[in-house]
Amino acid sequence: MRVMAPRTLILLLSGALALTETWAGSHSMRYFYTSVSRPGRGEPRFISVGYVDDTQFVRFDSDAASPRGEPRAPWVEQEGPEYWDRETQKYKRQAQTDRVNLRKLRGYYNQSEDGSHTLQSMYGCDLGPDGRLLRGYSQFAYDGKDYIALNEDLRSWTAADTAAQITQRKLEAARAAEQQRAYLEGLCVESLRRYLENGKETLQRAEPPKTHVTHHPLSDHEATLRCWALGFYPAEITLTWQRDGEDQTQDTELVETRPAGDGTFQKWAAVVVPSGQEQRYTCHMQHEGLPEPLTLRWEPSSQPTIPIVGIVVGLAVLVVLAVLGAVVTAMMCRRKSSGGKGGSCSQAACSNSAQGSDESLITCKA
């Protein structure tokens, strides 16, 4: 199994640049590769997405009408034609490599040719505030499970099972860790620093969160306090609840940070409290965009309670209305198709449009 980091980039490496800039906080660059085999339906589909921090900046899809590396951020559009030609060739070579690797892995695991299988990889680097390498990554997964990964020392590998040990021996014989380390310490760092400079208005901005605390009665005896952080960038943020100054980590419900769809992020943390004791609880928030940590309380006078029962009833009404609308539409379509006037109804064509490594949006067109 060949190394999935692009060898051409490694060969272009001539050494790291002198580091003089100081960055606000740490930054990262990640590439995510996914190859999915589809027996009887052509070659495996290969998709690559690249991120700087929390911003996608490049994408490639082998199923596109004209597969090419495509910019996904304004600050990378300024790269010249040679850059995009290199990116495109890199992805096409990787697609071929993954195609071979999928066949090999199927053999390692004694799997038939009938099923579909998935090979994923991620590689990249983190920079500290001084612009120097904090950590490098090179990780692989097969059918959703860890397969093999480059260790933090960038000199050795960890195999997840006996099949991965076959790959590990081949990588060690080829001195692949040295090549990966050269790329991660050199060109990866150099590229990330260039992107941070070109896109500094976007990538190095700090937008503070919009904050509030909501109150949701559960019963006569308990209520949920939810601390909200909205519209912030970058994604890293800390939310904690305290009772009389003591952390309530064990009793806090904390959701993962989520993209808001406009380049910013959202997050909330909730805690269930005894009714009448709400003022003993405080939400504490830290973010790069805040001049100092925030402490928030629920303010009864400024924010009315939001009964959970009311929310459930409201959602139920919306569901009923949606179902009724679908039934009416179906009846109208049936009537038209059986001889009524006004044209015909066709099924909506739906497709998956991957927006990033962790989510897909379903787009339906009538």
Curated annotation (Swiss-Prot):
UniProt domain Ig-like C1-type: residue ranges: 209-297
Region of interest (Alpha-2), residue spans: 115-206
Record-annotated membrane-spanning stretches: 309-332
Signal peptide: 1-24
GO BP: any one term: antigen processing and presentation of endogenous peptide antigen via MHC class I via ER pathway, TAP-independent
Sequence segments annotated as region (Connecting peptide): 299-308
Membrane-side (Cytoplasmic) residue stretches: 333-366
Gene Ontology MF annotations: peptide antigen binding; signaling receptor binding
Region annotation Alpha-3: where it falls in the sequence: 207-298
InterPro entries: Ig-like_dom (IPR007110), Ig-like_dom_sf (IPR036179), Ig-like_fold (IPR013783), Ig_C1-set (IPR003597), MHC_class-I_related (IPR050208), MHC_I-like_Ag-recog (IPR011161), MHC_I-like_Ag-recog_sf (IPR037055), MHC_I/II-like_Ag-recog (IPR011162)
Keywords: Disulfide bond, Glycoprotein, Immunity, Membrane, MHC I, Signal, Transmembrane, Transmembrane helix
Cystine connections: C125-C188, C227-C283
Cellular compartment(s): Membrane
Positions of glycan attachment: N110
Membrane-topology annotation of the record: Single-pass type I membrane protein
Keyword Aminoacyl-tRNA synthetase listed: no
Extracellular compartment residues: 25-308
Primary role: Involved in the presentation of foreign antigens to the immune system.
Protein's name in the database: Class I histocompatibility antigen, Gogo-C*0202 alpha chain
Protein's organism: Gorilla gorilla gorilla
